[in-house]
């Protein structure tokens, strides 16, 4: 029930040809191919940028490991609970 038989594909092809026309189908296929090429080239460009950023971060972490910077810690006390802000809710009688 989940797969389409060859007859279903043939009927689907006829409907597509009738809807879009035989002249517009090659243009649509060409446009789709061009869009896919652009998409793939953008993906490759993003992957190459990601690799260069990763290598730059690796070099940066190596240099920071060689020269560690001291960090000064400070103690922070939690605020004291106040009686004003919190009151018990009482049901209305």
Curated annotation (Swiss-Prot):
Subunit structure, interactors included: The Tat system comprises two distinct complexes: a TatABC complex, containing multiple copies of TatA, TatB and TatC subunits, and a separate TatA complex, containing only TatA subunits. Substrates initially bind to the TatABC complex, which probably triggers association of the separate TatA complex to form the active translocon.
Q: Where are the transmembrane segments?
A: 1-21
- What GO CC terms are in its UniProt record? TAT protein transport complex
> A Gene Ontology biological process annotation?
protein transport by the Tat complex
Keywords of the record: Cell membrane, Membrane, Protein transport, Translocation, Transmembrane, Transmembrane helix, Transport
Q: Per the record, where are the segments of Polar residues compositional bias?
A: 53-75
Q: Does the keyword Cell membrane apply?
A: yes
Protein name, as recorded? Sec-independent protein translocase protein TatA
Task: Sum up the protein's function in the record's words.
Answer: Part of the twin-arginine translocation (Tat) system that transports large folded proteins containing a characteristic twin-arginine motif in their signal peptide across membranes. TatA could form the protein-conducting channel of the Tat system.
- Gene3D superfamilies tied to this protein: 1.20.5.3310
UniProt membrane topology term: Single-pass membrane protein
* A Pfam match: TatA_B_E
Is this entry keyworded Transmembrane helix?
yes
Give me the ranges of the annotated region Disordered: 45-93
Q: Where in the cell is it found?
A: Cell membrane
Family affiliation: Belongs to the TatA/E family.
S-S bridge residues: none
Q: Which GO terms describe its molecular function?
A: protein transmembrane transporter activity
User: What coarse category fits the chief subcellular location reported for this protein?
Assistant: membrane
